[in-house]
């Protein structure tokens, strides 16, 4: 598939499957994804960071047949709220489409980033929504000291935390942001790299 065809496939998937509730939050999954990308674009002009923000929950949008295919090849399907392992499934799906290691790692890390931030920033954990606090229990709770040190040794750990903070802010009822087509060119650039 060309970058344009892949972008069309992704934008169609988000549009057609994004109208459902965003688990425990007062907005749709699509609105959440668009807001996350909007907040990422306010922080950075880096297309990989912005595209990862837009697609961070793509594992929630995939049809069951795609999830079953991907899940068979994914090593770790640790528990989660919503679709189990959606961050891992989404990262693998994007890798198969041709996205860079950085995009896929940012997507894969948005759940563990919450665990890291809860362990290292008291104000962060105090600011989480009720639904996000509830999901934290299922995601393993705050990281241990050894997990925190390991996290800090990983690639792009600061960007992973920034993306997570965009994710947490992206729950605003009625916030007007750009639509899906706003991100087509960035998606195509990420695929053409």
Spans of features found by a protein language model:
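Divalent metal-dependent catalytic cores for phosphoryl transfer on phosphate-bearing substrates
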Residues: 37-165
């Amino acid at each position: 598939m060309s970058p344009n065809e892949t972008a069309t496939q992704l934008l169609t998937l988000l549009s057609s499957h994004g109208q459902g509730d965003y688990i425990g939050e007062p907005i749709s999954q699509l609105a959440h994804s668009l807001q996350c990308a909007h907040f990422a674009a306010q922080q950075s002009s880096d297309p990989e960071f912005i595209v990862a923000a837009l697609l961070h929950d793509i594992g929630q949008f995939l049809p069951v047949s795609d999830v079953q295919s991907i899940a068979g090849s994914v090593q770790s399907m640790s528990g989660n709220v919503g679709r189990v392992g959606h961050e891992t499934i989404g990262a693998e799906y994007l890798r198969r489409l041709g996205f860079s290691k950085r995009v896929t790692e940012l997507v894969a890390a948005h759940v563990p980033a919450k665990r890291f931030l809860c362990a290292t920033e008291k104000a962060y954990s105090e600011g989480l929504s009720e639904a996000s606090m509830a999901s934290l229990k299922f995601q393993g709770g705050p990281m241990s000291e050894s997990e925190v040190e390991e996290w800090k040794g990983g690639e792009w750990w600061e960007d992973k935390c920034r993306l997570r903070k965009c994710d947490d802010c992206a729950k605003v009822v009625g916030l007007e942001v750009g639509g899906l087509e706003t991100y087509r060119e960035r998606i195509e650039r990420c695929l053409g790299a």
